């Protein structure tokens, strides 16, 4: 299995931002130079990037179609993107705009039957399921929903198994406790997922801070790692990460 580094940009109100543990009230802004940053990813040798529409994640209705098209055409990057994907029409529109893969998050937890139907319709390589998880006191990986204020009935293990059996290829999993914290990814979580469903191509997300974290994700047999804050704040050089 090849290993992919996904430099990431989260967009809100046209600006590159990062949220601390997904909290919209704890936002750091990094400027509105989205296209130049994407070009810099390509110039460093990246083949993929991860693009998130934070406005849509909150309100629904993906808003980055025009920007996505620009990035795809001008940089040659393959873009994995999502935020507010709630209908079949959303998926089709984002793919038509130039996405290589569409990320489905909240709906994948709320209505797995519908999303499994999309896998069959659009192809298992065109969707990435994103699951945000938090470990409870009993050690069970739960799936917080509705802005992480409630917990879904299904657990991470149950949904990951269900999607794997339905033919899902790409699973992006974020440990909420590590998101934006630069405290290192929770490699125990990813080892657990790899053992649970070895056929899944698991992407590491949340907490990556240095080359050792990238190397650990690769050594664990994960398919890739999403790098956000560490790149934006200069803790990690993209060329070095790509060469890892």
Curated annotation (Swiss-Prot):
Keywords: Amino-acid biosynthesis, Cytoplasm, Histidine biosynthesis, Isomerase. Its EC number is 5.3.1.16. It comes from Xanthomonas campestris pv. campestris (strain B100). Pathway: Amino-acid biosynthesis; L-histidine biosynthesis; L-histidine from 5-phospho-alpha-D-ribose 1-diphosphate: step 4/9. One of its GO terms (molecular function) is 1-(5-phosphoribosyl)-5-[(5-phosphoribosylamino)methylideneamino]imidazole-4-carboxamide isomerase activity. GO terms for biological process: L-histidine biosynthetic process; L-tryptophan biosynthetic process. It comes from the Bacteria. PANTHER family: 1-(5-PHOSPHORIBOSYL)-5-[(5-PHOSPHORIBOSYLAMINO)METHYLIDENEAMINO] IMIDAZOLE-4-CARBOXAMIDE ISOMERASE. SUPFAM superfamilies: Ribulose-phoshate binding barrel. It catalyses: 1-(5-phospho-beta-D-ribosyl)-5-[(5-phospho-beta-D-ribosylamino)methylideneamino]imidazole-4-carboxamide = 5-[(5-phospho-1-deoxy-D-ribulos-1-ylimino)methylamino]-1-(5-phospho-beta-D-ribosyl)imidazole-4-carboxamide. InterPro entries: Aldolase_TIM (IPR013785), His_biosynth (IPR006062), HisA_bact_arch (IPR006063), Isoase_HisA-like (IPR044524), Isoase_HisA-like_bact (IPR023016), RibuloseP-bd_barrel (IPR011060). Its main location: cytoplasm. This is 1-(5-phosphoribosyl)-5-[(5-phosphoribosylamino)methylideneamino] imidazole-4-carboxamide isomerase. GO terms for cellular component: cytoplasm. It is found in: Cytoplasm. The active site is at residues 10, 132. Belongs to the HisA/HisF family. The gene is hisA.
């Amino acid at each position: 299995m090849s290993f992919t580094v996904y430099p990431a940009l989260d967009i809100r109100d046209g600006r590159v931002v990062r949220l601390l543990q997904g909290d919209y009230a704890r936002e750091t802004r990094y400027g509105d130079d989205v296209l130049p940053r994407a070009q810099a990813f390509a110039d460093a040798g990246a083949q993929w990037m991860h693009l998130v529409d934070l406005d849509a994640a909150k309100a629904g209705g993906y808003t980055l179609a025009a920007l996505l098209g620009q990035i795809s055409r001008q940089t040659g990057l393959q873009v994995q993107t999502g935020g507010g994907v709630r209908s079949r029409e959303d998926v089709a529109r984002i793919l038509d705009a130039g996405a290589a893969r569409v990320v489905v998050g909240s709906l994948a937890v709320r209505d797995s039957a519908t999303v499994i139907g999309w896998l069959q319709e659009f192809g298992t390589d065109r969707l990435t399921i994103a699951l945000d998880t938090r470990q409870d006191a009993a050690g069970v990986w739960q799936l917080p929903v509705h802005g992480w204020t409630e917990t879904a009935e299904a657990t991470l293990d149950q949904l990951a198994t269900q999607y794997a059996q339905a033919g899902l290829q790409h699973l992006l999993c974020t440990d909420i406790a590590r998101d934006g914290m630069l405290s290192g990814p929770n490699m125990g979580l990813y080892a657990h997922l790899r053992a649970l469903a070895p056929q899944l191509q698991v992407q590491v997300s949340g907490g990556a801070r240095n080359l050792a974290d990238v190397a650990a994700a690769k050594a664990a047999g994960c398919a890739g790692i999403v790098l956000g804050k560490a790149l934006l704040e200069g803790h990690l050089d993209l060329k070095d990460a790509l060469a890892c």
